[in-house]
Amino acid sequence: MAASTASHRPIKGILKNKTSTTSSVVASAEQPRRTVEEELSKKSQKWDEMNILATYHPADKDYGLMKIDEPDTPYHNMIGDDEDVCSDSEGNEVMTPEILAKKLAAAEGSEPKFRTREQESSGEEDNDLSPEEREKKRQFEMKRKLHYNEGLNIKLARQLISKDLHDDDEDEEMSETADADSMNIEESNQGSTAGDHLQHKSQSS
């Protein structure tokens, strides 16, 4: 029986039949005509903007930005002892070359206070260290000094190399001139012996 009902059904194709289009036209004619506004409201979408803001822009969202929690770069103010060398109150005066030379001469012998503090604090830290740690720290400081002076060492090495090359060039030039002089002397000696030999032949004949 199931087979007989399946065989009686019409096979539906992909394309619309003419009868199906006419039936939809009849059905639409039966429905009351809607206004244009209802048609537009049916097709358009309404956005819930507050929901969009809450979804995509929550208050606690950080947008991948980092907050850096570290102290500002320290600024070392001039200590009270350095007021005679450099003073902000003297900034109002006209700076002449003589005054500048005096200030530079006065500041040349003194070391900045923050460096002396660092040296004092490093001396206090050495007392707390064991002998192995002191030796390790001393070696580290020595290697650090060598590393930071490496640029100066390279510059000096380049100067020495260029000086050696220049000296080698001068030595080669001197040896070449000495060789040329010895060759000239030998040629003149050979020429004079040949001349003597010719004179001797002419006298004997």
Curated annotation (Swiss-Prot):
Tell me what PTMs the record reports for this protein.
Answer: Phosphorylation on Ser-44 by ATM activates PP1 by dissociating the PP1-PPP1R2 complex. Phosphorylation on Thr-73 by GSK3 activates PP1 by dissociating the PP1-PPP1R2 complex.
Q: Where is this region: Required for binding PPP1CC catalytic center, displacing metal ions and inhibition of PPP1CC catalytic activity?
A: 147-150
Tissue-level expression reads: Central nervous system.
The UniProt regions of compositional bias labelled Low complexity, in chain numbering, are: 19-29
Q: Which domain of life is it from?
A: Eukaryota
| Any one Pfam family match given in the protein's UniProt record, by short name | IPP-2
Q: Which GO terms describe its biological process?
A: glycogen metabolic process; intracellular signal transduction; regulation of signal transduction
| GO cellular-component term (any) | growth cone
Biased region (Basic and acidic residues) positions are 31-44, 110-120, 131-142
Q: Which residues carry this modification: Phosphothreonine?
A: T73, T96, T116
Q: Which GO terms describe its molecular function?
A: molecular function inhibitor activity; protein domain specific binding; protein phosphatase inhibitor activity
- Subunit record text: Heterodimer with PP1.
- What does this chain do? Inhibitor of protein-phosphatase 1.
The entry's protein name is: Protein phosphatase inhibitor 2
Q: Which organism is it from?
A: Rattus norvegicus (Rat)
